[in-house]
């Protein structure tokens, strides 16, 4: 999956290290990120070639082996080589470990960007020098990176799995029922609620399968299998922007794997296809 970058090793522990010329520099602008000819993430040196960037204006984020990622809130102008493009380009980046490191870096850079002022008292915030945190110098509130949990559910009815298709975005592959966990819910509550809301089914024997960090929505996705309980007739939710366009039962034999295996969704669908024990027994 996307986060499986071995033999490279991901290091997310905080460090106060300073940037060097060949370190990677993440410059985010909303959901866009600065890229080199649309191909690679720029280095500190490449950005310094077009604008001034003092060492204290770059903040350490993470490392993959000896490749260090920093971000800055300096406004970097576009040039012939440097331009802003959708962060989603990193999902398919080659090599994959740079796509993963770049997107988690973008997630952190976005979090810093969204917390430039204290949400409680409006004072300009500061970066902690001891840990990955943002501190308000006036009221003392400390902000830590926030992760939004999501559940993805593979609903099974004997030898069939329920595949869905959403109307949102440009993503046209099949998917599984999914949604954010709401305040006050357990993961299992969220599974039952999302399934009922999206496809009008009751489920039982909810079982955890695996998880995936998903930087593009600052999420941690938890994948579950669940068996349909009672009538398997699908009633699609057709309200709202995230309405489902399709919800179909597909048998193991007819199931075609549409994805290279980057996403948890398709890893779970593959597990069903290959009769992984978690997909077949409750
Ligand atoms: Zn404050």
Annotate each PLM feature.
Residues 1-96, 277-282:
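N-terminal alpha-helical interaction blocks
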Residues 92-103, 107:
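Short, charged surface segments at domain edges that flank catalytic/cofactor-binding sites
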Residues 103-154:
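Cys/His-rich short segments
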Residues 28-29, 133-176, 180, 202-203, ...:
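N-terminal strand-loop-strand
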Residues 32-36, 67-73, 160-165, 176, ...:
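Short, well-ordered strand-loop elements centered on a beta-strand within folded domains, enriched
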Residues 53-92, 181-282:
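Unchanged
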Residues 22-24, 151, 222:
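Residue-level detector of short, conserved catalytic/binding motifs and their immediate flanks
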Residues 114, 149, 157-158, 170, ...:
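A generic structural signal for well-ordered coil/turn residues at beta-strand boundaries
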């Amino acid at each position: 999956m996307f986060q499986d970058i071995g033999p490279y090793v991901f290091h997310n522990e905080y460090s106060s290290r300073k940037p060097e010329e060949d370190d990677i520099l993440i410059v985010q602008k909303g959901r866009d990120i600065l890229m080199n000819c649309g191909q690679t993430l720029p280095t500190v040196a490449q950005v310094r070639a077009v604008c001034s960037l003092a060492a204290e204006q770059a903040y350490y984020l993470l490392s993959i082996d000896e490749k260090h990622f920093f971000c800055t809130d300096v406004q970097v102008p576009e040039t012939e080589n440097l331009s802003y493009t959708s962060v989603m380009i990193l999902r398919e980046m080659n090599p994959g470990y740079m796509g993963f490191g770049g997107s988690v870096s973008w997630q952190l850079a976005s979090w810093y960007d969204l917390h430039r002022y204290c949400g409680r008292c409006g004072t300009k915030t500061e970066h902690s020098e001891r840990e990955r945190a943002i501190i308000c110098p006036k009221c003392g509130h400390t902000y830590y990176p926030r992760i939004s949990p999501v559940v993805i559910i593979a609903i099974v009815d004997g030898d069939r799995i329920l595949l869905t298709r959403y109307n949102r975005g440009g993503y046209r592959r099949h998917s599984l029922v999914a949604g954010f966990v709401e305040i006050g819910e357990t993961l299992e509550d969220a599974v039952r609620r999302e399934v009922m809301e999206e496809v009008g089914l009751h489920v039982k024997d909810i079982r955890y399968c695996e998880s995936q960090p998903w930087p593009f929505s600052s999420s941690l996705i938890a994948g579950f299998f669940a068996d349909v309980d009672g009538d398997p007739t699908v009633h699609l939710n057709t309200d709202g922007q995230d309405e489902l366009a399709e919800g179909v039962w597909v048998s193991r034999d007819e199931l075609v794997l549409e994805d290279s295996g980057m996403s948890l969704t398709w890893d779970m669908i593959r597990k069903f296809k290959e009769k992984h024990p978690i997909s077949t027994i409750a």
